[in-house]
């Protein structure tokens, strides 16, 4: 059986890197008595894969990993068991049963929602209205949004406008806050800080990455009709009244 788990990450845990988070959840799953399947062979390991690695320093409400299990308790009991093993800064919020033919989350990721805000002690160079006018001028009203994208071996000009699905400016504690939905995944992956940095440059402003807190809200897959669906909605919750399920018994 395939299970998809959703979790939140905040506070000091935002400084824990992806590989350490993988090891953390491997231990947590074992201690929570989740009946996870192991690979075959001499160096057997848990069958677990994460959807989209989160950068160090970024908080999130929408992190995912998939596991294969032999049997499972209900969604409610499984979340409780996992959260009993969590430290402050990590909370499991979802646990759903996937179809037998479901693809791994990491291969499905197509987009993600982010909120970028100014950290305490840092001020925005523009007011909310000035940001809205600048984004309209340089992004929405422009036929393209060409930036220089650097790779390990080279750099090239890229029009990232088609890869930014949503971009708005909001107010939070009387400060501007940016909401973005951007292309994410193995094919076209755009980091939200890259977009904001490019906007700063178009406005002739100096960008300070230390001033910005990035928060990932959700991660999506793309359905056959082109619309987006959050990864958790691709599965079903396991009824709390059901008995412990195994691979030959599905509700």
Show the residue positions of the predicted features.
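Short, charge-patterned binding micro-sites
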Residues: 37-69
């Amino acid at each position: 059986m395939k299970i998809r788990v959703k979790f939140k990450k905040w506070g000091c845990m935002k400084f824990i890197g992806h590989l350490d988070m993988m090891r953390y959840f491997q231990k947590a799953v074992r201690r929570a008595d989740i009946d996870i399947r192991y690979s075959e062979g001499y160096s057997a390991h848990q069958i677990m894969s994460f959807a989209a690695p989160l950068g160090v320093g970024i908080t999130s409400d929408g992190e995912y990993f998939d596991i294969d299990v032999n049997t499972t308790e209900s969604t409610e009991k499984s979340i409780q068991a996992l959260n009993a093993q969590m430290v402050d800064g990590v909370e499991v919020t979802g646990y759903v049963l996937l179809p037998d033919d479901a693809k791994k989350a990491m291969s499905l990721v197509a987009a993600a929602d982010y909120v970028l805000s100014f950290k305490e002690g840092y001020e925005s160079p523009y007011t909310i209205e000035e940001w809205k006018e600048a984004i309209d001028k340089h992004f929405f009203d422009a036929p393209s949004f060409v930036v220089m994208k650097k790779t390990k071996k080279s750099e090239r000009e890229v029009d990232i406008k088609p890869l930014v699905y949503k971009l708005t400016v909001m107010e939070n504690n009387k400060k501007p806050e940016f909401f973005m939905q951007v292309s994410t995944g193995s094919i076209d992956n755009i980091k939200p800080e890259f977009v904001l940095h490019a906007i700063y440059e178009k406005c002739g402003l100096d960008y300070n990455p230390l001033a910005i807190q990035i928060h990932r809200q959700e991660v999506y897959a793309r359905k056959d009709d082109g619309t987006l669906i959050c990864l958790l909605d691709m599965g079903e919750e396991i009824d709390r009244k059901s008995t412990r399920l195994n691979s030959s018994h599905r509700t």
